């Protein structure tokens, strides 16, 4: 199973990635357990203390860039969308908040459709 975590180098993204690595498999109702083969951590920056595991792939880029989103979603089985500009930053830079929080989400959903 290949997993994409947008906002993957943020606090929650790193915690989620580590938990998934610890689990090693995911099981969905009515299906056999599936091994986690790759976790793509996608964010605007590399971040610190990213889990070190050969199954981790770190990709930096803009969540609102169609080419980047097409590349990181290619072959993905599961997506956790955590990328966001938090409230105070979005209020300080409204255009950035709209670009990431709205347009980035819309692009991701459209690409996955």
Q: For the regions a protein language model found, what residue spans apply to each?
A:
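Short loop/helix-cap segments at secondary-structure boundaries that form the rim of catalytic
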Residues: 47-54
């Amino acid at each position: 199973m290949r997993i994409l975590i947008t906002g993957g180098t943020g606090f929650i993204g790193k915690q989620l990635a580590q938990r998934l690595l610890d689990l090693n498999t995911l099981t969905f109702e009515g299906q056999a357990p599936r091994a986690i083969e790759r976790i793509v951590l996608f964010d605007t920056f590399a971040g610190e203390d990213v889990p070190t595991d050969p199954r981790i792939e770190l990709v930096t880029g803009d969540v609102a860039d169609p080419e980047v989103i097409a590349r990181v979603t290619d072959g993905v089985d599961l997506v956790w969308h955590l990328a966001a500009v938090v409230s105070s930053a979005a209020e300080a830079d409204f255009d950035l908040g709209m670009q990431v929080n709205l347009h980035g989400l819309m692009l991701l959903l459209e690409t996955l459709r």
